[in-house]
């Protein structure tokens, strides 16, 4: 996840400061904790604080990892059918009927006791992505010591309910334990990456069909983001991770996933296409590109109107498939959601859409009301528009 951003040049500062849209805090962060003029350091989640323009009026709240509190348990005498089942009358079933693999959502272990949310997830969606419990800090907090309890709970729920699962994520610069960030030896980091990838994918082999092998590795100019992976290994970490993934589970589809890929001519979008083509030509087994699609409303810099051309451009890369992986839209405009759904329907390589949460109450952007269900778990106009359009 990431706040929607267009990277802009910032004025130089005498003291070290993070640039607009840069990181400015979070667990394990050792860089600048103040922002350049015109930006405010805003907590996105416990691990990531970001320099956002101006004040906090339109900034996302802390992620639900640390803030979410389950509502009182509610019982249902008539639980909805499993497998996204509703007699062909659910988002997932309608999307599949149009030739796609899935229409999915994001949940995590801290949602499992929320009966209202989970009933919607069970009824409407055919694919699940973990929000946080498969990230490195959750799965390997210390070297060689793995913890799978929370990730397992989500996998068990998904498999028992017939849901596809996207593994999110194997390598990410954020929510990364300090022991990994402290590595400065090439051979050590290579071994750590390979072991992390192989251990997770071995555990879930045959259960997870897509993996975001690397997540948010590009900067806004379309080059590699500065991270421990790029500092120690350069571009080689991409091949190391993908080759380890392919060797461990040859049947899983392997993705590179990023945000701000919502305009066909934006430098980051072009950089993604160029780098993926280069890496694939070098034998790196990248199967797909995931575009997160954390979108602004009309008038914002990355509205839904840019998605059709951007998705078509990404599909032009030398990959087998593309997917919209973390969709949410400021204000949840009905026309905006239909525009994004049609973009995927009109691109042959687009295999599916994942919305980043079930309801506005549980969204990392809850003050922007970006999802298909409101804070009381009632379907919104965007949901109804999608059902009618599909």
Swiss-Prot record:
Keyword Ribosomal protein carried by entry: no
Superkingdom of origin organism: Eukaryota
Catalytically driven reaction(s): Endohydrolysis of (1->4)-beta-D-xylosidic linkages in xylans
Biotech relevance: Considering the detergent and textile solutions that are neutral to alkaline and must be tolerant to high temperatures and SDS, the three xylanases XynA, XynB and XynC having such favorable properties might represent potential candidates in the detergent and textile industries. Together with their wide substrate specificities, the XynA, XynB and XynC thermophilic xylanases could also be of considerable commercial interest in various other industries, especially in the brewing industry.
Gene3D superfamilies in the record: Glycosidases (3.20.20.80)
Thermal activity characteristics from the UniProt entry: Optimum temperature is 70 degrees Celsius.
Keyword ATP-binding assigned: no
pH dependence, record text: Optimum pH is 6.0.
Any single Pfam family the record assigns to this protein: Glyco_hydro_10
Leader peptide range in chain numbering: 1-16
EC number: 3.2.1.8
Keyword annotations from UniProtKB, A to Z: Carbohydrate metabolism, Glycosidase, Hydrolase, Polysaccharide degradation, Secreted, Signal
One GO term (biological process): polysaccharide catabolic process
Family, similarity comment: Belongs to the glycosyl hydrolase 10 (cellulase F) family.
Record's function text: Endo-1,4-beta-xylanase involved in the hydrolysis of xylan, a major structural heterogeneous polysaccharide found in plant biomass representing the second most abundant polysaccharide in the biosphere, after cellulose. Is more active on soluble wheat arabinoxylan (defined as 100%) than on birchwood xylan (72.4%) and beechwood xylan (665.3%), and less active on insoluble wheat arabinoxylan (39.3%). The major hydrolysis products of XynC are mainly consisting of xylobiose and xylotriose with a small amount of xylose.
PANTHER family: ENDO-1,4-BETA-XYLANASE C, GLYCOSYL HYDROLASE
Record's protein name: Endo-1,4-beta-xylanase C
